[in-house]
Each structure stands twice: as structure tokens, then as C-alpha cells.
Amino acid sequence: TINEFPLFAWLNGDLHAHMMGPPFLLLAATLCFAYYLTPAEAVWRRRGLLFGALPPLAGLLAVVNTWSFPSVAGLAVLTVLFAPAKARTLLPARVAEWLDTDDWRLDELLTLVIAGGSGAVVVLGGLVVSAPFWLVAASGRELALFPSRSGLGALVLVHGTFLLVFVPYLLRHALPRLRDGWRTAAMLAVVAVIALLSRAAAVLLFLPLIGVGWALLRWRDLPGGVGSRIGDRLRPGRTDATTSVSADGGDADGETDADDTANGGSTDSDGSLLPWPGFETVLLVAGAGLVLLVEFVYVKEQAGPGRMNTVFKTYAQVWALWAVAGGAALAHLVWQHRPGLGLSGGRWRPALQVFAALLIASTSVYGGLALTTHFASDSAYAQTDDPTLDATEFVDRVHPKEAAAIRWVDGLDGRPTITTAPGSYVWDGERNGGSSAPSSLTGVPTVLGWHHEIGYRGQKAYDRRAEDLRTIYTGDPNESAALLDDYDVRYVYVGPAERATYGSALEGITVSAVPGVTIEKQWDAVTIYEVDQSEL
């Protein structure tokens, strides 16, 4: 599988959906965080965040990066499930009061149903907002089950850095709450058996993270100390009326006192209040769920063999979520030392500080080396003496023969359809590699873009358009005219890539012989023909 991390993706510079989506996914996580921090009595604010702000954002993500669309709903479900404010307070007061129960099993089931329903509302709202996209988008993809799974070594190699942070973070919250080590060991043994039977090493690594994170956020004690109190939440002072927490999981006012214990906060053997994990644990559980999901389900498509593309696009989201969660968790390990936390105080304080320093230094090596040319090179792409945020400025330096023509296309009114040679991965027009630059750099639609469209549209659709383009450029004038009319083409672009692709034909490029096709603009290396649709 492909496993790109964000810095590599941005340095590589492919403006793929998996690069454009993370900022919007993190915006969705931010809205969920705002919901998480909102007091229970602010019902309409929470409803507005959940049902007013998230659905339009989900709809936007459906268009920008469809892979992230269901993830927004997943974040919404987990946030409603784990937030300090009880899920049922989202319902009308009379309904919430009627559904109130002392049976923790029914309460947990009700919470799951409301959280799932909230996610469904986000999905439906997103579908409505992005309806035009779904109505015109073509897809021959389908879900498939039980792909070849990742080995333990590969998973540790890709996710090991995050595990180095998340495991001690969860342990320091979990250890003080353990009441029965044997029961805990038995549960871990069950996880190991499941991993063995499912032949999925990911189950062994990530199911405990999900289970411990879930238990810390939902239940008062971990296995062994649960008893009849399993339905009680850890957070002190948690009522349907008032609940507010800070970013790191503490009270909004930063205070803890004896009243917290009286209100239901867990205590250790010394009577010290047990701190609870923050919203970063929600992101941790979300990312672990995504990693586990792609071990069993994948999208069957033509963008790569098996689950290659599914892992690629899903892990890009995991990186975004876990990078934020990992930063908060690492800061917690270094700075938060108090009674009630495991791995805290004494020799743990300097040990964790050294650990954090080594971790940051070791994981920063790639960035330091990869960015060297961005600050010490005067190549055609990296101009350190005159830096710019304009990602298209390189065209004038690297492709001066086509720069003026591309600027002309960029200045066209509206969105007229043009034709270009099918693009390849690298822009090298004289070697049959144009990358559809007149279209990709301007946003003007072209009949056929680069070959990666095969993964989106299918091999047959791509081949059909490729053959139609060859006919437009080199075929019989009458056949060319019919295709220009079918695709509503306004301009035909003939540059280095088009000459390399079609110029070797028997009669070369013959589009100029089509009635209604005339030269609109010409440069030394590029000729742009205008198509008069009324004369075709």
C-alpha cells in the first residue's frame, strides 16, 4: 500500500484530494471540539454546531475529498457519545425526561442510538448540500470485504511513532483506575485471540486503544472496578444541567475539590481525584477506528490493486487526526503531573521530558533534510532570493514556451471547454508528457485530463475519450467536427505535448481543416484554434 505522510505529500506537490481534505477535516474536528466543550445547558449552541455547522461542512468535503465525507459523521458520532453533556439533552426536554432511566444498560443503548442518529443527520444534510455533485459524479466503485491485511511489523513501522505517545498517555489514565489486574489480563487475552483468529495484527495493536479510550471516556472505572457504577461517567459534577470542561480534560475553571468527588468523580486509594482524558482521546479513538476499518473493508476500484488506494486515502486522514491528538497527548505527558495520574511525578517527569525531546528530534530529521533546498537552493522551482506563495510562478522559468499561452487560457471568460493531449505524471511536453497543463493550471475544463482519470472514470471511459481526442486532432474533418460538437469544444490547444502525441500520425495534426476551426492565437511553440460551433 501507499503510505504518504503530510509533509511528503505537500513537498511532492500533487494537488490531490487527500492533500486538500485534511484542513477541512480538522475544521470538522474543531467544531466537534467546540461541541465537546459546550456546557450541557447550552442546548441550542450544541444543536447548532452539530446540525447547523457540520452538515454543510460534510457536504463541502464530499466534493473536495469524498473519502473524508463519512469521517465527519464518524467524528460527530464519537463526539456526541463521549462529550460531557449527555446525548439525550439534545432531544426536547420532555422526551429526554421520559427517556431517563436508572438502568445503565438502557442508558448506554440510548446514548449509542442518539449518537448514531446524530451522525445520520450529518450524513443526510451533507448529501443534500452536495446533491449536484452526486447527481453528476460517475463511479463504478463498490465496497469489498476481507482484503490482504498488514503485518505487525508494517503497522508498527507506519504508526509506531503515534503508538509511542498514545500507549503511555492511555496508561497514565488507566492504571490508577484498574481494580482487578487478572480481569484486565483476561480481556487483553481475548483481544489477542480475536487478532489470531482474524489474522489481523491491527486488532492486537489498535483494538485495545479503542477499548481503553472508550472506557476512559464513557465509564467511571476500567474492568475490575466497574461493578454497578459502569453507567456513571468519570467527569466530576456531570449533570444534565451544567457540564463544562477545559481543553485538557479538566474543569473549565481549572479547579478540583472535594465537591467533585461528591458529585461522582472517581478517586484512587488515597482519595485523590482521578483526572480524566481530554478531547484528544476522541481523536485517538477515531483514528484507531479508521486504521482498523481498512483491515476488513476496502473500496474496490481501478486506482490500484486491492486496498492500496483505500489505505492511502484513509491513512491520510489518520495522520491529520493523530497529529493533533499526538501533540496534545505528548504535551500532557510532559507537563501534567499530579496525584491520580499514572507515570507521573518523581523520576517520570524528567524521563518523559527526555522521551519527548528524543521523539521530536528523531521524527524531525526528514523535514530538516527535505526542506534544505527550499531555503538554500536557487533552482528553477525554489527561488530563495525571491520567495513566493504562487505555486504557478515556476511556469515562466521552467516552461517559457507555453507560459504565455497558458496565461491566455487562464484569462478566458467563463469555463469554455478546450482540448489538450492526455496528461502524464510529469510535464515534459516534448517527450509526450503535457500533464494537461493548460487545464490543470487554469481550471478551464478539458475533454480528457491525465491518465489517473482511469481510477475515477474507468478504463473504458478513458480509452473512449482518448480515441475521440485522436480523431479530433488527426481524423477526418467531418468526424472531428461531430466530436467537437459533442463535447462542446470552444478552443483546441496545440503545443509541444500535442505535437509529440499526434504529430507523428500519417498526416499529422489536421484539426485546422475542420470547417469553423480557425487560428485564434499563436506563439512560437503554441497555436490555439477557436471553434465556431455554429459552423460545425
Regions found by a protein language model. Name each.
Residues A9-W10, F51-V64, A189-L196:
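Membrane-interface alpha helices of multi-pass inner-membrane proteins
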Residues L112-L127, M187-L188, D260, V334-L369:
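Signature aromatic-anchored transmembrane alpha helix within multi-pass, membrane-resident enzymes
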